Regions:
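Conserved ABC transporter NBD signature motif
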Residues: 70-81, 88-89
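The feature captures the beta-strand-to-loop junction immediately N-terminal to the Walker
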Residues: 47-49
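Hydrophobic anchor residue at the start of the ABC signature
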Residues: 168
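Conserved ABC ATPase "signature" region
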Residues: 125-150
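Helix-to-loop junction immediately C-terminal to a conserved catalytic motif
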Residues: 62
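A short, flexible loop at the N-terminus of ABC-type nucleotide-binding domains that lies
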Residues: 4-17, 22-33, 82-85, 99
């Protein structure tokens, strides 16, 4: 018997949004009263017209933005950067910004390894020495997106599509 299927939907959620609204200023509401559960182990696509709030919704979901009203919970916890469990939960949320956010003059591999930083809790060792298992994972992901052979190439030397795949690989870290 699969016990997971007998649990209430909210028990399976990694992200819960309850009556969330968001705005960038006091005048213009971008999102209004959004409620949703993002279930663990599932993939979602957010589709909408330009300016409809897709990026804003993603920023709310991964803790990059605080809602104007309502609450966003991660594994049933309110955002708290001092809480170790919260930081672990939020580090599992991949996000590919529209501008990609690649670090110029660094290699493809280094850009992908940036995705491991929230888990490592040690930003001081940024490019010095990543654990061997993180480097192996990065190579596996680069292989998955067809870029492992270019792992040492500088990102500014890549095509637009290759840069997008580097950003996807980083989100998968």
């Amino acid at each position: 018997m699969n016990m997971e299927n007998t649990l209430p939907i909210s028990t399976l959620s990694i992200i819960q949004m309850r009556d969330v609204s968001a705005s960038y200023d006091s005048e213009n509401l971008i999102l209004k009263n959004i409620s949703m559960n993002v279930k663990r182990g599932t993939n979602y696509a957010i589709v909408g017209a330009s300016g409809s709030g897709k990026s804003t919704l993603l920023k709310l979901m991964n803790g990059m933005m605080i809602p104007s009203s309502g609450v966003v919970l991660y594994n049933y916890q309110k955002p708290d950067l001092k809480n170790k469990e919260y930081k672990k939960s939020i580090a599992k949320i991949g996000y590919i910004p529209q501008t990609l956010g690649l670090v110029k003059n660094t290699s493809v591999l280094e850009n992908v390894l940036i995705g491991a930083l929230p888990r490592l809790n040690n930003l001081k060792s940024f490019f010095k020495m990543f654990p061997k298992e993180e480097i192996e994972k990065a190579h596996d992901i680069l292989d998955l997106v067809g870029l492992d052979a270019k792992s040492e190439r500088k990102v500014h030397m890549l095509s637009g599509g290759e840069k997008r795949r580097v950003a996807i690989a980083r989100a998968l870290m």
